[in-house]
Amino acid sequence: MTLRRSILAFTGGMILVLALICSTFMCHMMMGTLSDLEEAYVHQKVDGTLFYLQEDLSSLKRAAEDWGHWNDTRDFVIGENDQYIQDNLNSWTLSGLDVDFMIYYDRSGNLFYSRAFNHATGEEVPAPGRLLSLAKDDPLIAHSSPEDGLTGIVSDPEGLLLVSSTTILDSHWKGPISGTFIVGRRLDGARAEGLARLSGIDLRMAATAPVGESEGTNSKTSLLIVKEDSDTLIATKTIDDVYGNPTVLLEAQVPREIRSRGLETIRRQVVGIFLASLLFGGLILLFLELSILMPLATITSSVEAIREQEKGQGSRIPTVGPAELATLAESINEMLDHLESYNQKLAMSEKRFRTIVDTAHDCIFIKDPKSRYVLVNPVMERIFQLPASKMLGERDEVFFSAETAARIREKDAGVLSGEPFVGEVSAHTRAGSSMTFHAVKVPLRDDRGQVTGICGIARDITDIKEAGVELLKRDRLLSASAAASYSLLVNYDIDQIIIDVLQLLGEAVEADRAYIFENQTVDGEVLMSQRYEWTKGEVEPQINNPVLQSLPYHPDSSTFYEIISRGRPYVGLVKDLPESERAYLAPQGIVSILIVPIFVEDRLWGFIGFDDCHRERFWSNGEISVLQVAAGSIGGAFIRSRTRADLVRAKGELQERIGEVEAKNAEMERFVYTVSHDLRSPLVTIQGFVGFLREDLSALDGDKIKIDLAMIEEAVLKMDHLLKDTLSLSRVGRVVNPPEEGSFGEIVHEALSQASGELRSRGIKVSLAEGWPRVRVDRLRVQEALTNLLDNSIKYMGDRPHPEIEVGWRPEGEETVFFVRDNGIGMDPDQWEKVFGLFYKIDPDSEGSGVGLAIVRRIIEVHGGRIWIESEEGRGTCVLFTLPTP
């Protein structure tokens, strides 16, 4: 677009925008005023409707007072005017008063008489039921003074009612109050239409809630105005009924006449303002075109014609327009004269220089003082894979990374100050490749000796440098592999040495992450899990990533598994891998990956992997070969570690078995001693009383014979209890039921059912926890343990006035702790461990054999749990234990 067109377009656009802004502002301001007028109009209409409604109620109140304060009405209510109904309560009377019903209540608040007519049909109809069953304290009939009265709206199931109630007095408006006179009109559709005609709007009135629901409320709402459509507004307002409750809804449809007329006026004014603005803008544009833009266009077209000529010799610009533009044309003509002479000299020099530049095998370039390329040769085009047209005028930031460009600018600054540069330059291109150049840069000077640019020659020595770097990397990798192999041979701590080996190898190959995965087979499916990992400080570790545990090879990594199972490395860029593999590699930030399989005894044990999370890297064959050797060393280390672990485990199991045998022998000795001692006591008792029995039989002493037999029977029963408890203890751990998974709460309820009789007889309150966890146990044994604990709590409850037992659970770390707590007699801390001993009793004279807690402990320990006591003498006992959960 030419300058002329740009100026015209810009100026015209600004004028148009200003016209639109003025029109919009005017429209917005007037629309706000129009909305206020429309709202005021709606308020006026609704207020008019309410005024007419109030006038209707006022006329009704006057009728009520005229009839209520009348001797005939008073005599009728007190039963002294039998002609009142015939003379006064007929259809033409009600029609003349414009009322639909009259209702009379006596001074006791009881309904005395009611009459209602349908004026359209002239027939008598029932009075509104809502007014025939008023409570005696209803404000309509409950009066505290002769002046009392209520006028308003009442909600009836059949519709709204206009009602006025007043006291019944004599014709002089004096008491006493003889009753209540209620007169009213139905606020039906016809009456609502009459109000609508008076106010000039469509009107609807209805109850907001069923009769009686709104009594007691005090809320009031203001007028709510909403738009139904573009032509109608809906105004709603809640009106208080005769009781002061907002139960009457008034809804009015108001035509938007003001809005229609106002919008038309606004449209006309906006169009007028817009057209006036356009006319003014057109005059401004015409002035610019004639005085400035047309002369400027003539000069511009002449310059363009000269530029398009092959050499532009002999062509000049006409001097037209104002003085400033004519002077500009003359200056341009002088410049053209100098330019023709300079071009001739430059053409010959350019031809010579171009021959040298185009045939050189090194990069040749020239930069201006701002380090912009003004000349590049074909070698630079080939290296950067860009045509010269894309390179000229650009700085080094376009071709190199920001860091490289900054270093080049620093060297260029020295050259521009007059100091030549000779040396190597390491560069990173924007495409991500690394290059090394041997560069020579010298300053370019003009005829006055001023530096006008930089001329440089650069030779690409990247291949030479990379070859040297690769040799150094291979030496470092071989050294790391040798050190890793040595460490794997001489160290036994396989877990720590593997981490050290991963660090050695990872640093040697300049990886960001090195790791080892181990395979395992579950239900015939081969899974892989990460076991070891080393990472650089800035790279996020993945050793705790649950996604990398028990990860199946199939189907997402089938190709990967097929490659490494053949002993081949898996290498590549993550972006080029299948989508199924990228799904879990990309979230780890991996860019390039190398996987080397680890075989143990000719079986794919797992693999060692190396990640580069910062660059797209292509692993060399030399690196892969060395890492394959290292993977073999790691596999051998795992074989040796497993062999050592098997030996240590076998030795440990042997020592454990020896310890178990020794412990069982010691336990057996204690058991035999205790059983022989406790069983001998009943036998001695039996033997002694058998002697007494012989003597008593000889003496034929019947009473003593009974005593002797009772003591012998008691000793036999004691021996039977001891034998049963001993047998039960011996079965724990030997007679085992299959473990079952279920709620621990079910086991608790089963144990409580066995002890329920004793609990009820002792009046013991039992509290149970909620949300019981699931356990996998021998249900019968655990139920037996709980029953013993409940029996102990009952037995040692003492004489507590409010005995209680609590059975519950709580999580503690990775364990689930169950407990049975009572508020019994408790025990000293020095008894906490003793009570689990065989046949041990705190009170030797108490019931039982002292085997119960020993059985409980044995049951818990057989399940792999532990049991302990928390107690204080006089403050109850809590037995706690753990059990395995699924």
Swiss-Prot record:
Highest taxon of source: Archaea
Gene3D superfamilies reported for this sequence: 1.10.287.130, 3.30.450.40, 6.10.340.10, Histidine kinase-like ATPase, C-terminal domain, PAS domain
GO CC annotations, alphabetized: plasma membrane
Membrane-related topology note: Multi-pass membrane protein
Regions crossing the membrane: 7-27, 270-290
The keyword Mitochondrion is assigned to this record: no
Domain PAC: 421-473
Reaction equations catalysed: ATP + protein L-histidine = ADP + protein N-phospho-L-histidine
Residue ranges constituting the HAMP domain according to the UniProt record: 290-344
Keywords assigned: Cell membrane, Kinase, Membrane, Phosphoprotein, Transferase, Transmembrane, Transmembrane helix
Main location: membrane
Signal sequence extent: none
Alphabetical GO biological process terms: osmosensory signaling via phosphorelay pathway
Record carries keyword Kinase: yes
InterPro entries cross-referenced by the UniProt entry: CHASE4, GAF, GAF-like_dom_sf, HAMP_dom, HATPase_C_sf, His_kinase_dom, HisK_dim/P_dom, HisK_dim/P_sf
Post-translational modification summary for this protein: Autophosphorylated.
Enzyme Commission (EC) number: 2.7.13.3
Residue ranges of domain PAS in the record: 349-419
Primary enzyme class: transferase
Protein function: Member of the two-component regulatory system FilI/FilRs, which is involved in the regulation of methanogenesis. Autophosphorylates and specifically transfers the phosphoryl group to both FilR1 and FilR2. Could also catalyze the synthesis of the quorum sensing (QS) signal molecules carboxyl-acyl homoserine lactones (AHLs), which regulate the transition of the cellular morphology from short cells to filaments and of the carbon metabolic flux from biomass formation to methane production.
NCBIfam families, sorted: sensory_box
Protein name: Methanogenesis regulatory histidine kinase FilI
